């Protein structure tokens, strides 16, 4: 099982990623060892998650979300 996640960074930007172990991945981000993008924008908050049965489906959905406009991402997060 993979989790797609969106986090809101300190500058109010949104970062989308996937993880097999979400809790572990969030700790990595918080410790500044995750993506360079998030590292430069700490602290952050988790605002959205989706579960996917495998990496392939999670990656496909991640790419769909990354192509969305900011407004569509905000709507997804609210709903």
What are these regions (language model features)?
Residues 1-52, 56-66, 70-79:
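GIY-YIG nuclease catalytic motif and its immediate N-terminal context
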């Amino acid at each position: 099982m993979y989790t797609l996640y969106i986090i809101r960074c300190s500058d109010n930007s949104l970062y989308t990623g996937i993880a097999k172990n979400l809790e572990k991945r969030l700790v990595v981000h918080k410790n500044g060892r995750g993506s360079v993008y998030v590292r430069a924008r700490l602290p952050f908050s988790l605002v959205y998650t989706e579960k996917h049965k495998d990496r392939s489906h999670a990656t496909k959905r991640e790419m769909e979300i990354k192509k969305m406009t900011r407004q569509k991402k905000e709507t997804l997060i609210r709903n």
